[in-house]
Amino acid sequence: MHVTRHIRQWTMPLLLAICMSATAQSIREEIELIPQRSAGIRYSLPTNEQLTDTPVPDGKKPFYISHYGSSAAYYLDNTKDYTGPLSTMAKADSLDKLTPLGQDVLHRLELIYKDAKLKVGELTEKGAQQMRQLAQQMVDRFPEVFVKGSIVDGRSIVRNHNILSMQEAMIQISRACAPMDLRIKSSHSNDAWMYVRDKDLEADRYNEETEASYQAFRMANKDDDRLMNLLFTDADYVKKHVDSIILSDQLFVVANTIQDTPLADQVTLYDLFTPDEIYRHWRIHNARTYISYGRFALNGTYQAYSQRAPLWNLLHMGDSVKNIGHPVVHLRYTTRGMLTSLICLMELNGYGLVTADLDQLDKQGWADYRIAPFGASVQVIHYRKDMDDDDILIKVLLNGKETRLPIESDCAPYYHWQDAKRYYLRKLYAYERLKYENETKKQKK
């Protein structure tokens, strides 16, 4: 990735206009141009885009990088994700119920499963390469931080692909830089601020009203009859023995997984779907991501608050490193779902969108492949002139790009650390107060 530094005016109104221009039509065009984007959070963040950095005000230099990222591309976690559609098609074939295209699709599914069956949940080779490239980009972009004597601390949740992603990144950094203090840890002791589950919020995630809204949206966007007619010779057999909604979705999910495997240039399933069908499938998955990790009005708008502990950690560590006399890098590798919630909680680029209308998501530019694809990250870069400089500035990068925060700044995309910290602390304390009040009311009943 080539990084250029340039001088430009960055204002809140301009950024808001850019954000609001992300209409449903532009998202649809993006997906039609690159169908792999329909994979949503399984789309791989490109590593060949040219990024730009606005010059830092007042000659300040980066001294601390606080990073929360997801793993790079990996195979599906569950063998049944591969065997489900395969068994449905194989059974139909044994009864002579497949069209020639259906038989060809069965053969493709067999090839895909053969490649994946012993690698379920593992990092793909392309994923490993992606993580090395992203690490190198960070080094190239902030050379002042990766110097002799710097501390680079890598932490991962206890998942195979997260551990390997962290490992690939740290190996690349060690190769590219002068001797540094490199530390790696993967432990459940990190779960309190890296793999956070809030059972109370999860219990409300798909309440009755939310489930009804999602199912209505899902049915409005489903159109599986054409595909079933292409694959099967007997409509009556399909009606009695095939769940067309499930099979269509299974084929779509598998289609999206191929892009990061050795079969990417050999096999596709996208040809089974029209551009409109691909877009509709993506809308359904995007809506589910939003309901689960965003700020959907019908389940209370608070699902993103499940990741308040990581935000507390970002704020705490930002103050803790100020008195350290050498650069520090904290790299944390968690899930894309949890990263999505953190991004929504921080309201980066307006992704803290609150709506009860799932049709509004793409119209408002809320697209999961833009938010937390494979290799996604939130990087908070801290800047100062020297250790006596109390006016620390931060810049937040979302997936490598300069990002708008929900606060005013006289030097955006840079923000005064004290302003950002104050805003987020108030937000977190307000939620804790609301939670306490609700618990008190329950106890009085």
Question: Where do the model's predicted regions map?
Answer:
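Bacterial Sec-dependent N-terminal signal peptides
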Residues: 1-27
